[in-house]
Amino acid sequence: MSKNSNVNNNRSQEPNNMFVQTTGGGKNAPKQIHVAHRRSQSELTNLMIEQFTLQKQLEQVQAQQQQLMAQQQQLAQQTGQYLSGNSGSNNHFTPQPPHPHYNSNGNSPGMSAGGSRSRTHSRNNSGYYHNSYDNNNNSNNPGSNSHRKTSSQSSIYGHSRRHSLGLNEAKKAAAEEQAKRISGGEAGVTVKIDSVQADSGSNSTTEQSDFKFPPPPNAHQGHRRATSNLSPPSFKFPPNSHGDNDDEFIATSSTHRRSKTRNNEYSPGINSNWRNQSQQPQQQLSPFRHRGSNSRDYNSFNTLEPPAIFQQGHKHRASNSSVHSFSSQGNNNGGGRKSLFAPYLPQANIPELIQEGRLVAGILRVNKKNRSDAWVSTDGALDADIYICGSKDRNRALEGDLVAVELLVVDDVWESKKEKEEKKRRKDASMQHDLIPLNSSDDYHNDASVTAATSNNFLSSPSSSDSLSKDDLSVRRKRSSTINNDSDSLSSPTKSGVRRRSSLKQRPTQKKNDDVEVEGQSLLLVEEEEINDKYKPLYAGHVVAVLDRIPGQLFSGTLGLLRPSQQANSDNNKPPQSPKIAWFKPTDKKVPLIAIPTELAPKDFVENADKYSEKLFVASIKRWPITSLHPFGILVSELGDIHDPDTEIDSILRDNNFLSNEYLDQKNPQKEKPSFQPLPLTAESLEYRRNFTDTNEYNIFAISELGWVSEFALHVRNNGNGTLELGCHVVDVTSHIEEGSSVDRRARKRSSAVFMPQKLVNLLPQSFNDELSLAPGKESATLSVVYTLDSSTLRIKSTWVGESTISPSNILSLEQLDEKLSTGSPTSYLSTVQEIARSFYARRINDPEATLLPTLSLLESLDDEKVKVDLNILDRTLGFVVINEIKRKVNSTVAEKIYTKLGDLALLRRQMQPIATKMASFRKKIQNFGYNFDTNTADELIKGVLKIKDDDVRVGIEILLFKTMPRARYFIAGKVDPDQYGHYALNLPIYTHFTAPMRRYADHVVHRQLKAVIHDTPYTEDMEALKITSEYCNFKKDCAYQAQEQAIHLLLCKTINDMGNTTGQLLTMATVLQVYESSFDVFIPEFGIEKRVHGDQLPLIKAEFDGTNRVLELHWQPGVDSATFIPADEKNPKSYRNSIKNKFRSTAAEIANIELDKEAESEPLISDPLSKELSDLHLTVPNLRLPSASDNKQNALEKFISTTETRIENDNYIQEIHELQKIPILLRAEVGMALPCLTVRALNPFMKRV
């Protein structure tokens, strides 16, 4: 056992309690959190339930005692007789009242006090999402903080002999691990630890008064804003209908809400056995259901409408209702099937367990490389994410779920992980007897790792194991991997699952194919925490409950009778004659396989499954019982052919929860409902607005990012007294939409517009866009922010915010504005606007010499996606930067305004600073590059990156920095500590979204808040209702960002495929970003993509990694062209993908000749049809970056080869790969897949010159 494990084990024996200062987690975070220990995975949950049950019984007894005492006192007062013995007793014993959370009377006044927990919504309870605690719960309660060891039952659901940790002890262990790293000379992160002893004066001799679980609320604690008695009645969305309803906006039934199908007494629970449900009436309707009477159209608005608010993940129940989960049934459930997962803890108990520090709440993020593993982000409660090892510990949680996690000793989890990976290797070895073993510290799932033996104090890439199911293990037993015979002499047969040649790993073929999809289907590589034997996770845990799941989620994918892993061995895995299950493979790799009952599949699917192999379907998950390895779901609709461009776009929208049917007329689904029209403004409502319509006085120009709709306008005026006036005007959309109306509810449901190169999904109906868009000479109602600036310094002297009307003189698209600004001779008017924007930017990053370009476009995209989409995600024009900087200033001004007046109710936007461990890793990487700038503050970090002169290096470092940062989030001020309001990437202390109400619903909320401030009227919205809205807007905004990125990737793949249509691949220059022992990452600037070059895809003899100097040496087979090379294990047609057919037909020399010839003749590589398509979309065709050799006598291929660093030692042909080096690579697109992929290879520099 490792040193860490011994430390933790010794610590569990200590009699004294230990406390660690919390790092965040909400406005009511605890000062100290106790620790508990256990010996098996299920023991603590049993103890919890027993304690809660006993505590409630104790509270009932105390309440009865209190009533009896009160009756005795009343009787004594009436009779005038006092019993001296009773009097003395009464002076020393005052029974505790029942905790309001457990009152049987749901209408008790105590339910609205500090102890109340709203059950009408999700992700709005600070006890869940912000890990909120009562500061006084533990400070005077040492009995509850003591260590406990009980005789545990056998661990039937998980791993035996693992210790559980309270939040406090987990932080202590993490701090010790960090301290050891620092003492060893490694860059790390310090964790603040406070050793606090429990107050001895609070100790009691009686267990009844000493232990209170959960503790009673402190009568003297401060007012809690989240649960104030002043709050209005609970929020209901949509509101009750008043009068006639002119639309068919119908709430979705619970059978279509994933979060409503769990633990619901009216439907099969998530823990239920699906086989036992066959006798129940079928509640799941599907368009493919083979019962005509129940057929429904799942494309209708009524059916697919996700709920307007988040719904509670589990139905509220008394805590005793889940005791059956831990009954004496052993390994079997009530139906006799083996339980594969642990049942969830009852929802009613979890808030108090979180308050006690026994559980932590957070958002689960699936490890895309190994989908059974995951990480949980705790929103600041911990200084690092929690590692979840294996599907059992993940316990059926999905990407984006809000989960409750019990922390475990890291060493125990890590040892278990290593044992499982070794077991996996042995099982794979039964089918692969000629392979060389990996070192025990190697990562089975990642050939980009750096082991302790070769890393020389460098962090490795993530590793994780899959302790999954019998089915998954059987799949891995059947994996086979053969390698190039040219290097067989280098190794000897052993018992292992992955072959190694020096530092070069050989992945199984199925793993290669999986990596192609994981790495190839995104623009940038997705990285997780860097962990290995030397740098273990700081925290580990297992999921004990899913608190909330985003409702109404849909997934696109393909349908088959066999699992994808079985299809590779289809000869030996023929489907049964009458299969009961079809397998739905989601396009999103983070979503598990979904079992679809064949009766819900197309009618002829079983007989003609091959006919549907190229079809895309939409499915949803309905349940996931503890007895099943996979979730069960239903098919919602058939999208169409997998190669159809329209189907591809629809698939992206469905995967990201945009159905685009909110405004459609049910009578004519091809059109929007004609009754959706903006409310007209009366003359009286316009009178009190400030008037900016005089075109002689105000030269207002509107900005149209897309060229046809405008919501933002500017004017600049010289006041003549040494000041300038900058007016910023935003369309007053909410004046035209009644709050709570049908349009308002539908806009809230859509929440965000989606901007893709191929398609636009607006937030509002088209009639609103046409009517409300700013236009020259058209008077429009706006909300304005007017700054008075000093003419010389451009500092703000005063600010006016209010309602207004404007009449723009002109309208400019971003392209037109950029053209005027980039000509070098813009008008003085536009020059003034540009200089004001530069001044705002310089002050924002605290750099007086700052210029608008270059900009950190990736960091800025963490807050908001682009409206004018480019094919390269890194592209930013000067016009875009100028307008965006002014908008940021307006947004921050409005944020200050509403927060000053509304306080806790203000809807704001923040971005948390990166997790300390991720920032330490980033700092280590840039130090390896030779850069060492300050990373302690956002402004210094931004300035440090911007000062890098080399564009490729600067962008490369920005990519690495981008991966350390979370996306910005909406929040309600009263739910977050004020010191966490800041927006890190923008370096602003307070921020919100205000300037885009025609594409973001969050701006509608801010507009209404601002109007309440302007008119000095009470803002009556409930804080909990605002919390629901903010969380839903966060979810849909992230979906909109992902949809945009996937659509860009789709079009980029199409473009690259077209450019390389003649040769199958492109040859271009790339910059090396990171080097590992078996692979390296490259960045291709002209396409804005980052990809990984795998050593086992190249004709290499071996590879050697120098961890000290960060150099990877590739030992090439001379004369073998990597452009036409196919590894031996991929030559079997059944072992690889059809998408690479004809991709290796041209040699590297032919590719180089064609590219350089076309460049010399100024001929485009792209075809005319695609060139026209991109031109119509206002997109620029990428230009390949080709080498420029001074020696004109070199042929085309030699020009590329001359950029490499090579040497020949004896018979070894070696290429050196350094970080930040520019090397030639081969790029290809694979478009015959549900989502196309981009893959890269390195060019072999040791080929015959032709």
UniProtKB/Swiss-Prot annotation:
Entry-annotated residues carrying Phosphoserine: S40, S164, S183, S286, S322, S491, S492
Keywords: Acetylation, Cell cycle, Cell division, Mitosis, Phosphoprotein
Short name of any one Pfam family annotated for the protein: Dis3l2_C_term
PTM sites of type Phosphothreonine: T227
Entry similarity comment: Belongs to the RNR ribonuclease family.
Miscellaneous: Several alleles of SSD1 exist in different yeast strains. Present with 1100 molecules/cell in log phase SD medium.
Record's protein name: Protein SSD1
